[in-house]
């Protein structure tokens, strides 16, 4: 297209592509608000992620919090939740954290992943997404999770996961274990936390197809 009509051509092409979408014309998109992120000398805090930087060891300890409440019963409730919907919020925050550590913390060569929360709640969110995968918004959220995990997979850092009592490496979060170069699982409980739930891993259907690596293998 000539430069004089380039902008109009782009708009026309985008409109034609949008018409092919299966998203109902009455549906509204979600506004992605700026991420809430606080950066300190050795700490980065998001809503669902806390990162502690151990500069002496060149390691970033990345603690991911599982969902605080169960997902809605109906897929129609996801849109009103906007970017606060846990899987979408988590994907955005992990994506941002990966890029921040890659670009701004080049001396941090090891990323150590921890999780904390209720694995049953993580599984419930996975089930909601999978049962409604044909919904346009759910599909986009799953694709966002897939892209984010691919970005992690190709990051030139040593990836470690620590599977500890009270962790929730279930379904989508189990992908962190599968992507890691090394994983360590504690057998038993910490002496000062006898009330904790023993460490466990729990796959869901999210681990068997929807989230392939860059090579196409799950």
Per-range role (PLM):
Residues 2-157:
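Intrinsically disordered, low-complexity segments enriched in small/flexible residues
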Residues 1-28, 134-218:
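Conserved catalytic cores of soluble enzyme domains
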């Amino acid at each position: 297209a000539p430069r004089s009509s380039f902008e109009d051509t782009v708009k026309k092409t985008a409109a034609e592509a949008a018409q092919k979408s299966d998203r109902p014309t009455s549906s509204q998109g979600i506004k992605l608000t700026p991420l809430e992120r606080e950066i300190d000398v050795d700490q980065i805090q998001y809503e669902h992620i806390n990162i502690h930087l151990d500069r002496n060891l060149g390691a970033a300890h990345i603690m991911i919090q599982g969902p605080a409440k169960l997902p809605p019963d109906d897929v129609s409730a996801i849109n009103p939740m906007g970017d606060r919907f846990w899987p979408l919020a988590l994907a955005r925050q992990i994506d941002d954290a990966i890029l921040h550590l890659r670009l701004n913390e080049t001396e941090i060569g090891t990323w150590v992943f921890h999780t904390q929360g209720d694995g049953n709640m993580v599984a419930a969110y996975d089930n909601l997404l999978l049962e409604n995968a044909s919904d346009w918004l759910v599909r986009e959220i799953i694709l966002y999770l897939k892209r984010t995990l691919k970005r992690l997979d190709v990051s030139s850092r040593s990836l470690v996961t620590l599977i500890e009592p009270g962790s929730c490496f279930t379904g989508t979060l189990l992908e962190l274990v599968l992507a890691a170069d090394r994983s360590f699982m504690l057998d038993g409980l910490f002496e000062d936390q006898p009330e904790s739930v023993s460490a466990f891993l729990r796959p869901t259907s999210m681990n068997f197809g929807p989230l392939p690596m860059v090579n196409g293998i799950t």
